């Protein structure tokens, strides 16, 4: 019973960290990565919210630019429109689109670092809520006399250790992203 609660908490905490990592990949650092275009949607064949990566291949042209190559060449105008809507400035090169990523200003990098910290804090709150849920489940087992007082204490200690380890992981992910942001 306690192992199930602990495993469930670990799985949910790991998902919170994965969600944080995914969110942080979409924050522009000045380095061009295809993940920056994950949230770009285009109007493809009547569907207004088709993800860009389903209608084009996205690759790195160099460290500061991406190359978007549509699978269907007639989609270039719609892809350009989707990129403009997502606040990118595409340059059409015949059958492909190049997107230059200028490095952010010092002020913008500091804003982005604050955003990274905010996202990290959100992940920590999610992890603490998972801890709270697990502790409630343990308390319910204790109340129902399904476990002893010692098992309850041990279970709560294990959940706390799990929480501390996952919060440390969040701190590392946030610190790595901030370092990447603030280095020019």
UniProtKB/Swiss-Prot annotation:
GO CC field: cytosol
Q: Principal place where this protein is found? A: cytoplasm
- UniProt xrefs under Gene3D superfamilies: 3.30.1360.40, Ribosome-recycling factor (1.10.132.20)
Q: Which residues form a coiled coil?
A: none
Recorded hits in InterPro entries, A to Z, give: Ribosome_recyc_fac, Ribosome_recyc_fac_dom, RRF_sf
Tell me which Pfam families the record gives. Answer: RRF (PF01765)
Annotated GO MF terms: ribosomal large subunit binding
One GO term (biological process):
cytoplasmic translational termination
Keyword terms, alphabetized: Cytoplasm, Protein biosynthesis
Q: Which HAMAP family match?
A: RRF (MF_00040)
Q: What is this protein called?
A: Ribosome-recycling factor
Location in or out of the cell:
Cytoplasm
Asked if the keyword Lipoprotein belongs to this entry, the reply reads no
Query: Would you say which domain of life the source belongs to?
Result: Bacteria
Function summary: Responsible for the release of ribosomes from messenger RNA at the termination of protein biosynthesis. May increase the efficiency of translation by recycling ribosomes from one round of translation to another.
Q: Which NCBIfam families match?
A: frr
Annotated family: Belongs to the RRF family.
